[in-house]
Amino acid sequence: IFMEKITDRTPSEALNDNLKGLYMGMDIFKRYEKKCKSNDLKNLLNDVINLYSKEACELSSKISALGDSPASNVGILGKASEAIYNIKTVTADTDSEILEESIKAFKTGIIMFQKFLHEKEDQLDEESIDLVKNMIQENEKLSKKLNEYSSPHQANFF
């Protein structure tokens, strides 16, 4: 009811929505990183946090260049979504559960960027398109690392 389609938003509003999503992702992955025990998994989750932080800076700069104010937090709707993820964070106790939830959350972020690009590409300047495409590529590379890490640990998921 409260969610607008991405197509109903201006390009900078939609970029801001993605920025809020990055803030939410950083919060979620910071919680996961604190809970996990494996140093390798902590390092991998820290890579996600660092990537999201870098992308948040890039999006903020682009939104400012478009003449709008970048979001500085997840916003009201983001808080509601964050509450749902908080429940999942609380229930994910083992490293394998944390990894499984991390992969799901990370894939959701990639899907949101792909959806944004699909619905907004004809309204974006070339620089914005390149920025989002690069973000998708960087996220897909890190997604491969998460999946590669999960392969030897997958037996713990079932």
Task: Label the predicted regions.
Residues 10-18, 39-58, 95-102, 125-138:
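Alpha-helical scaffold segments that form or flank carboxylate-/histidine-based iron centers
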Residues 105-158:
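Preference for long, well-ordered alpha-helical segments
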Residues 57, 61-97, 104-111:
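Carboxylate-rich helix-loop segments that flank metal/cofactor sites and access channels
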Residues 5, 43, 50, 70-87, ...:
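Charge-rich, acidic-biased intrinsically disordered regions
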Residues 4-36, 97-122:
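Alpha-helical bundle segments that constitute or directly flank the non-heme di-iron/ferroxidase center
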Residues 32-36, 66, 87, 91, ...:
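Secondary-structure edge/capping motif, primarily at the C-terminal ends of alpha-helices
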Residues 40-77, 146-150:
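Conserved alpha-helical segments that form or flank metal/cofactor-binding pockets of metalloenzymes
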Residues 18, 25, 32, 55, ...:
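Amphipathic alpha-helices that form helix-helix packing interfaces
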